[in-house]
């Protein structure tokens, strides 16, 4: 069973800029990558990774795990409808792996990978979320 918990990040201005930049860069990279997948008619995650991983990292400066997440997200979108190259909104949700580029540091801090390194951001959660927080694992989307 999937469990969804919503938390409110409380970044300062510098952290907010870093978080905004990774969201925008991720979505820009995903839109570019979708065009590559469409042009090569590549609907295979491993095939697309072989085709574009190094250029994706060099062109957009994404951390390694973020580039892999970008490839996976593009494949999910492209496989739904192969008749066009999907385009992501600049502020669309970005998936983060709780093992690689996101980690909770105590009851009220989260460490998040950005383009310039990690930022440690305070967050708030409600009673419902706090009661179920120990069960959370897997993937996180930043909206």
Identify what each model region corresponds to:
Residues 1-143:
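Nucleic-acid substrate recognition interfaces
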């Amino acid at each position: 069973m999937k469990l969804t918990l919503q938390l409110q990040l409380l970044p300062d201005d510098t952290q907010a800029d870093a978080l905004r930049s990774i969201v925008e860069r991720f979505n820009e990279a995903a839109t570019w990558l979708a065009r590559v997948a469409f042009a090569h008619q590549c609907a295979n995650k491993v095939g697309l990774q072989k085709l574009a991983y190094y250029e994706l990292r060099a062109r957009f400066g994404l951390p390694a795990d973020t580039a892999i997440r970008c490839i996976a997200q593009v494949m999910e979108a492209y496989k739904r409808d192969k008749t066009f190259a999907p385009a992501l909104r600049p502020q669309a949700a970005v998936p983060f792996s709780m093992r690689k580029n996101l980690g909770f540091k105590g009851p009220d801090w989260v460490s998040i990978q950005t383009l310039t390194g990690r930022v440690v951001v305070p967050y708030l959660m409600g009673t419902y979320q706090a009661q179920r927080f120990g069960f959370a694992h897997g993937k996180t989307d930043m909206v």
